[in-house]
Curated annotation (Swiss-Prot):
Keywords recorded for this protein, A-Z: Methylation, Mitochondrion, Protein biosynthesis, Transit peptide
Domain of life the protein comes from: Eukaryota
Any coiled-coil regions, as ranges: none
Keyword Protein biosynthesis: yes
UniProt similarity note: Belongs to the prokaryotic/mitochondrial release factor family.
Modified residues (N5-methylglutamine): Q270
One Pfam family it belongs to: RF-1
Principal location class: mitochondrion
UniProt-recorded name of the protein: Putative peptide chain release factor 1, mitochondrial
GO-annotated biological processes: mitochondrial translation; mitochondrial translational termination
GO molecular function terms listed in the Swiss-Prot or TrEMBL record: translation release factor activity
């Protein structure tokens, strides 16, 4: 049986080709997968072996130092994952060498078949290796709570903010997630908002959407513009892990929250003036306040307000625990100033650009539908984020 030149070429490039192939499929660069991931894993594996050798001689050192014990446990997981990857790599390398030196066609084919079987295990091995280096936080699996508000740009900003809300609702529907408003303040007579808070409930919703937090900028010619000038407006998007009221006991003591009730100030006739249905919560230690008047029921407004407060406090606690990384990346919104843009939506050029990774797509209308193209765009950003974390991660 004769092998094609294409098949022989494929396997003569060994594990380096495997890594490049997987990198392309996942959106990584070869540089980041082969060098950063593998070298970091190799270094940590070597560190584990050194610890292991020392602690075999002095078991009391690890027993008496809980921080050291935790670090060694983390290093052990990296070492085990790296050892599996290294074993697969070496098997492929040995088989490649045998295939190159063997003259018998049948033996060559047997080597190629075995290489193919082992190669199919490489993607899972790389994924396991990544997960030991970058274990996902528990919050990644939580539902997401999203807050969107217009920034610079007046009415045009309020219209754009509403378009973002619709885009995320459509994306939730595309993913099969449940999406519902907690609070929405609409601009009368326009498809525009001054604020929207909504939850997206689905497995991993927060992990999928957390990198959407930031200032989104729109550039287009408004319908009311008589001279054809392009206007620039912004909207802020805040993405929080949604923590249910049942899980809030670990976040604060009930005595730390001041609860105020008042009459609703929105439009709605005499009911607004007679019933104290609006609720304002203040978390005294942090000064975080949440006001809710979306429902005519005080009980419902209080429940919604606590849901928002829980999510904000959970995000605040997470930010404190990861202050160094948060300051490096500055992913979350601090204001809606134009200079802090995370992404630009240029309608005149039919282009959307994410400024963190320099990624552009010239099909803005399809992107705003929140379906497959939007999902692919977000996946590339998540991959970029993992690359950055790999570059800067430390095992502690």
């Amino acid at each position: 049986m004769l092998l094609t030149k294409k098949v022989l070429w494929y396997f003569r490039h060994g594990i380096e080709y495997q890594i490049r192939s997987i990198a392309c499929k996942k959106g990584y660069s070869e540089h980041n997968v082969s060098r950063v991931l593998i070298e970091k894993a190799r270094s940590l594996s070597s560190e584990y072996l050194q610890f292991h050798q020392v602690n075999n001689k002095d078991q009391s050192a690890m027993t008496n130092d809980t921080d050291l014990a935790k670090r060694i446990a983390r290093l052990r997981r990296v070492h085990n994952a790296y050892s599996k990857f290294k074993s697969l790599s070496e098997q492929i390398s040995d088989l490649k060498q045998m295939e190159a030196q063997e003259s018998d066609a049948e033996v060559k084919m047997m080597a190629v078949t075995e290489i193919n079987e082992i190669s199919n295990k490489i993607p899972k091995s790389i994924e396991d290796l990544e997960n030991t280096l970058l274990p996902q936080a528990d919050s990644y699996a939580l539902p997401a709570l999203i807050e969107i508000r217009p920034g610079v740009g007046g009415t045009e900003a309020a219209i754009f903010a509403n378009e973002l809300v619709e885009m995320y609702f459509q994306y939730a529907n595309f993913k099969g997630w449940n999406c519902k408003f907690i609070s929405k303040s609409a601009v009368q007579g326009l498809e525009a908002i001054t604020e929207a808070i909504f939850s997206i409930e689905g497995e991993g919703a927060y992990g999928h959407l957390m990198l959407e937090g930031g200032v989104h900028r729109v550039q287009r010619t408004p319908a009311t513009e008589t001279k054809g000038r392009v206007h620039t407006s912004t909207a802020s998007v805040i993405v929080l892990p949604q923590v249910s009221n049942d899980e809030s006991s670990s976040l604060y003591d009930s005595s730390e929250v001041k609860i105020e009730v008042m009459r609703s100030r929105g439009a709605g006739g005499q009911h607004v003036n007679r019933t104290e249905s609006a609720v304002r919560l203040t978390h005294i230690p942090t000064g975080i306040t949440v006001s809710m008047q979306d429902s005519r029921s005080q009980h419902q407004n209080k429940e919604k307000a606590f849901l928002v407060l829980n999510s904000r406090l959970a995000a605040l606690n997470a930010a404190k625990e990861n202050e160094a990384e948060r300051l490096k990346r500055k992913n979350q919104v601090t204001s809606s100033d134009r200079s802090e843009k995370l992404r630009t939506y240029n309608f005149n050029q039919n282009r959307v650009t994410d400024h963190r990774i320099g990624l552009s797509m010239h099909d803005l209308s399809t992107f705003m539908q929140g379906e497959e193209k939007f999902d692919e765009f977000l996946e590339k950003i998540r991959i970029w984020n993992r690359e950055q974390l790999l570059l800067h991660s430390e095992i502690v």
